[in-house]
């Protein structure tokens, strides 16, 4: 539909930069320096939609390691014709995932801890 899109891990200016939901406007406005209509970024696992910039900016969240203390998978749907974006959630049974983690590597508690954060 003619949109210029940038996909990046951390931010448009640094692969490993953390763009958190509470980022200042000064930091967020750096996204406007890109020559695109929409930026999708990740790294923090926090779902974000910033529509107050000249560039629509979206972190779709995380399917397996949510950091916003909301259970389940989070992702974004982008309607390119309407240029409308929405975040979606799907709750899933963590017990099965945690059991699989324990079976695969019983000594690695990191992923188990991430999945059960409150």
Task: Identify the role of each PLM range.
Residues 51-118:
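Acidic, His/Gly-rich catalytic cores of divalent-metal-dependent hydrolytic chemistry
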Residues 1-38:
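Conserved catalytic scaffold of divalent metal-dependent phosphoesterases
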Residues 1-2, 50-52:
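Short acidic-hydrophobic surface loop/beta-edge motif
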Residues 8, 38-43, 57-61:
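Active-site neighborhood of phospho(di)ester-bond hydrolases with catalytic His/Asp-centered motifs
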Residues 13-15, 38-51, 65-70:
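Active-site environment of divalent metal-dependent phosphoester hydrolases
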Residues 16-17, 45, 60, 112:
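Generic secondary-structure boundary/loop-capping signal
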Residues 28-37, 41-43, 76-87:
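Hydrophobic transmembrane alpha-helix bundles
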């Amino acid at each position: 539909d003619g949109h210029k899109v940038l996909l990046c891990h951390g931010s448009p200016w640094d692969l490993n930069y953390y763009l958190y939901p509470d980022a200042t406007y000064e930091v967020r406005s750096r996204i406007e320096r890109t020559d695109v209509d929409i930026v999708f970024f990740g790294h923090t696992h926090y779902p974000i939609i910033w529509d107050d910039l000249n560039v629509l900016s979206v972190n779709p969240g995380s399917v397996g390691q949510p950091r916003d203390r909301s259970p389940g998978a989070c992702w974004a749907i982008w309607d390119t014709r309407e240029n409308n974006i929405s975040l979606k959630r799907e709750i899933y049974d963590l017990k099965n995932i945690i059991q699989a983690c324990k079976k695969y590597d019983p000594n690695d508690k990191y992923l188990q801890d991430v999945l059960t954060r409150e």
